[in-house]
Design a protein with these regions (language model features):
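ATP-dependent small-molecule kinase phosphotransfer cores
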Residues: 36-106
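Small-molecule kinase domains that catalyze NTP-dependent phosphoryl transfer to phosphate-bearing small molecules
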Residues: 9-12, 118-125, 131-182
Length: 182
């Protein structure tokens, strides 16, 4: 069995984490997000429980003290506050440290490909990008217009996954895609 590196792209609520969790359960894929280190930094800086940056409901609820949602905190910390100083690839470089440390595993899934530079790195490492599309999902307000929500370009070799049914239907589609990925 060959090692697989899968990057998942799509709007908020499209099913990226659902697919990543399923690949962990079914195939033993290790989940390494580009935002793992960012979430840890955000929890420390803003004094919040890390779950505020993971739980869908919590990350959309405004934190009165800061006057914004945890999602917005990470958007601003992850781009405006760091990329101008450390470069556009700061989170990619940090992700690569984590990815390199677990190369003894067979499969790795990245549930949060938000920028073309991230997708290119995964492709360069021999990985596959899966674009997950689910009708009627996405963000509202300031979070929706942030550059991290713009999506990435579909390239030759990328795959498309439509998530318009039940979780069981999604799992079945993932199983079929998994078999075609080399």
């Amino acid at each position: 069995m060959s090692k697989k590196l899968i990057g998942l792209a799509g709007k908020a609520g499209a099913g990226k984490d659902t697919v990543a969790d399923y690949l962990w359960e079914k195939e033993g894929a290790i989940k390494i997000a580009f935002a793992d280190a960012l979430r840890a930094a955000g929890a420390s800086i803003f004094g919040l429980d890390p779950r505020n940056f993971l739980d869908r409901d919590l990350k959309e609820a405004e934190v009165e003290y800061w006057g914004m949602t945890p999602r917005r905190m990470l958007q601003l910390l992850g781009t405006e506050a760091t990329k101008s100083v450390f470069g556009d690839d700061i989170w990619l470089k940090r992700w690569f440290l984590s990815y390199s440390a677990v190369q003894d595993t067979d499969h790795v899934v990245v549930p949060d490909v938000r920028f073309d530079v991230e997708a290119e790195a995964i492709r360069h490492l021999g990985g596959t990008i899966i674009h997950i599309v689910r009708p009627g999902v996405g963000l509202d307000g300031d979070s929706a217009t942030h550059v991290s929500e713009a999506g990435i370009e579909f390239r030759f070799g990328d795959m498309h996954l439509s998530n318009s049914g039940s979780v069981e239907e999604l799992h079945h589609k993932v199983d079929r895609l998994w078999e075609t990925i080399k």
